[in-house]
Amino acid sequence: MAGKLKILITDDSKLLRKKLREELEKLDCDVLEAENGKEAIMRDLTEQPDGIILDIVMPEVGGIETLQVIKDINPEIPVIMLSSAGTSQKLKQTLELGALDFIQKPYTSEQIKQAVEQIRRKVEENHDK
C-alpha cells in the first residue's frame, strides 16, 4: 500500500483527539475523528477508514461495544485500543474480540508510530488476500 492511511480516532476527549491527530498527521495519515462509539460506527460505514484507534472507556456506547459492532460489519479492519490504567481485563476482552493491539495512556509518539505500522501491515496483508 503506497498511499496514505486513513485512520479514524475515537475518543470522548477532544484534547486527546487533537494530540492524536497531530501525531498521525506527522506520520502522513489522513485523520477522521469521532467523539463516541455511535459516531465511530457511522463513520466506519460511510468513510471506510483503513484502521481505527479506539478508546475503551467512553460514555453511551463504550469501546468494547463499538469494537463488537465494527468487527461484525468489517471483520478485517485493524483496530488499536486505547486504555487508561486499570483496564487490563477489558483489554484482554478486546483482543479476544479481534482488536489488533492496545496502547496504554499516556502514550508516546513511538507507540503511535508502531500502531500505524501495525495498521499498515494489516491493510497490506488484507489487500494481498
Predicted regions and their residues:
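Two-component/phosphorelay signaling modules centered on CheY-like receiver
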Residues: 14-32
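Acidic catalytic/metal-coordinating carboxylates
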Residues: 36-39, 62-65
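Active-site beta3 strand of CheY-like receiver
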Residues: 47-53
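Receiver (REC) domain active-site loop signature in two-component systems and cognate sites
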Residues: 58
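Alpha4 helix (beta4-alpha4-beta5 surface) of REC/receiver domains from two-component response regulators
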Residues: 65, 86-101
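C-terminal output helix
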Residues: 89, 107-117
